[in-house]
Regions:
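Structural preference for solvent-exposed beta-strand-turn elements
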Residues: 1-368
Length: 368
């Protein structure tokens, strides 16, 4: 293989596909990127046997061919090359020469035949959605994905696709995040996408919010195509919780709150909460105000701010981090909290509209 290409394009492509590369593996080829030159382009592939990322850049292909190079080493070298054109020459003796200007590296390559072939997913296009919409849905829900490997179905995000609606759901047993958006889909399907895949999809989506993202899916695989990248991933098997059954049907207390005021108050109260001292926040919702209290061995705090409260007065215990996560991901000037009782899941919604629905599970006080 013998090619010449632009350093900036090559560096960006390497960084993109490296998200699917295993950094430490007993199989060295899985730590590499497959480079394949043909026609007028260079194809780059990273694949960790669960997720594969492929992209293409323009190149002056003097000799077609393919080779596997260590991803970490290749990324470090290219990023430190001078600006301009980079040449890559792979010889039959297993050595690859990479040169830009007066800088020249010679590194050991790996045979392309050893690189695992990406599966033929057989996934058919299911829906097309704007980049900005999909990124917003991912960003608003990913925080609630479970880290508990004992419940693998909840370590991913549920994609519930209907002909006219896409619902993305994440939960971890303590909180729930739901975002729905109107779409036009070809078929109904319910899949669980690994959180790692969703993280990398969000990172690789183009900056143009209007650019389309093509999503193809079946029962085993999902494929995202956008911004010159194709991201293929295996799906998580298992049953996702019937999340609709845990959403309270009614509420006895409704509170409309300035989001920034609430975040600032919780952040101040959190100063006396540590990993070792995890006492819950004690939050009272009364007519016209919200009072936040907390006491640990470091000290105690009382803070309050004005709010529009309707219905029964109530005092609830919250994990400070879980409540902060919901408020920070709301991204609205005001939120509405709907409360059924001191031990029932609390709804967090936008003050107007239905952009999202978050649930936060209260914490029982020790003296209850």
């Amino acid at each position: 293989m013998n090619i010449v290409c632009d350093k900036v394009l090559l560096s960006a492509a390497i960084d993109g596909v490296s998200k699917a590369v295993t950094m430490r593996s007993a199989i060295p080829v899985l730590e590499g990127i497959l480079l394949k030159a043909e026609g007028f382009q260079l194809n780059l592939t990273g694949y960790d046997l669960e997720m594969g990322i492929v992209t293409t850049i323009e190149a002056n292909v003097k000799e077609a061919g393919e080779v596997v190079l260590n991803a970490k080493l290749l990324s470090s070298m290219i990023s430190r090359m001078p600006a301009g054109q980079v040449s890559i020459l792979s010889a039959e003796n297993g050595k690859t020469t990479i040169q830009s200007g007066v800088v020249q590296f010679e590194i050991q390559s790996m045979p392309a035949n050893d690189f695992p072939e990406l599966p033929n997913t057989g996934a058919e296009e299911t829906l097309t959605i704007k980049t900005g919409v999909l990124k917003d849905m991912i960003d608003r829900t990913l925080y609630a994905v479970s880290q508990d490997e004992k419940k693998p179905a909840h370590t991913g995000e549920l994609f519930e696709i209907l002909p006219d609606k896409l619902t993305v759901v994440a939960l971890d047993g303590y909180r729930l995040a739901i975002v729905e958006r109107p779409v036009t889909a070809v078929k109904d399907i319910r899949i669980i996408v690994p959180s790692k895949t969703m993280t990398e999809v969000a990172h690789l989506l183009p900056n143009d919010d209007e650019e389309p993202v093509h999503i193809s899916a079946n029962r085993r695989y999902v494929v995202f195509m956008a911004g010159g990248y194709t991201i293929m991933s295996r799906l998580i098997e298992g049953e996702f919780l019937n999340y609709r059954n845990v959403i309270p049907a009614d509420s006895r207390t409704r509170v409309t709150i300035d989001t920034k005021d609430f975040i600032s108050t919780i952040e101040r109260a959190s100063l006396i909460i540590t990993e070792r001292l995890k006492n819950p926040l004690r939050i009272s919702f009364t007519e016209g105000r919200v009072v936040v209290r907390c006491q640990t061995n470091l000290g105690r705090v009382v803070d309050e701010f004005n709010a529009d409260c309707e219905g029964d007065e109530v005092e609830i215990g919250f994990n400070n981090r879980y409540l902060l996560d919901a408020l920070r991901n709301a991204r609205t000037e005001k939120v509405r909290m709907e409360i059924s009782g001191p031990l029932s899941p609390v709804k967090v919604l936008p003050a107007e509209g239905n952009d999202f629905l978050y649930l936060v599970l209260p914490v029982r006080f020790k003296n209850d």
